[in-house]
Amino acid sequence: YLNRTVQAADLLAEVGADNAFIQYDIYHAQRMEGELAATIEKYLPRIGHIQLADNPGRNEPGTGEIHYPFLFAHLDRIGYQGWIGCEYKPATTTEAGLGWRQSLVR
């Protein structure tokens, strides 16, 4: 198992495939290593997909300790161009669990 981003980056370097990227799971990264913004920035060229879930609880963004408004602004600032997907359990209903998206409307 890979428990840290550096392990995934080292594996990609060893394989040498330019078309393979890290799927950065924010929930697990926060649990295992923290420092989300710094880690994403450091490994930005190797990250191709980011999964969203808050911590603790693996619920939707805004229900835990991760400051998603800062993190989304940081992704914009550093020029992240990859995919972002959601992999969380809604704290209540699916409809209510999608409410966090309204904070992204500019």
Segments predicted by a language model, with ranges:
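Histidine-acidic metal/acid-base catalytic patches
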Residues: 2-24, 28-106
